[in-house]
């Protein structure tokens, strides 16, 4: 994304050092990305420009937007709360595990970012056809999107599994062998199940598009709830340890996938999509 590119530029120049520099780079990158989007939209999408006659209050639209945004806020809050709880557990295993987790999560997020954005585009496609009543196109689009997401996720899984060590070396010095080993274990466990999160992103997008955002919240709670509960349970076993945290993440994805697909079959029958 443009935000991440700008952040890398600001960080590479290192105008402000340390944590303050990273924080400043993040804020500046977000501002640059927002400004770029505004300029692009104004120049290339005249239909989205504001005009005086558009400045009116619509109570129905406000109510609809508020209902959707509230559920989205709940979804994001649950997601971040779960991540914080897992991060707290990871921190209890010491600095080496903390450093490995921090580096591996960045690689992990970058690896599945394309399928996440694909899920957003998929949501737009479904919403347009749902509004137009084109359920036949929705059905074909769902099949095509799932195949595409699975194939892409499998490809990325292979790349991350094979190149786990070189990827860790982007963030870690070669002599920090413990951090590299822990990070590689994380990447290879998560990477083997990228299909799970790829499908989950499609399910999030699908339920938002057909005006069932509450289902996206349910899937998020299932995924993150499973991750948190299993993380604390498995990590408490001496024979499992920190590896249990890594395994809890894809297990959460897969459980949410099963529930989401089961509900999709029901919704498909009811709505004809």
Residue ranges of model-derived segments:
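Hydrophobic/aromatic residues within the transmembrane alpha-helices of Major Facilitator Superfamily
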Residues: 2, 35, 77-81, 110, ...
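Alpha-helical transmembrane segments of compact multi-pass small-molecule transporters, enriched
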Residues: 3-4, 170, 226-227
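Helix-terminus/linker motif at the lipid-water interface of multi-pass membrane proteins
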Residues: 7-17, 77-106, 110, 128, ...
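Transmembrane helical elements of multi-pass membrane transporters/channels
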Residues: 29-33, 37, 41, 59-121
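Short alpha-helical transmembrane segments in multi-pass integral membrane proteins
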Residues: 10, 14-70, 126-193, 235-273
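Alpha-helical transmembrane segments of multipass membrane proteins
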Residues: 5-13, 38, 84, 88, ...
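Membrane-helix interface segments
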Residues: 18-19, 96-97, 213-215, 241-242
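Small-residue-rich hydrophobic transmembrane alpha-helices
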Residues: 100-164, 197-219
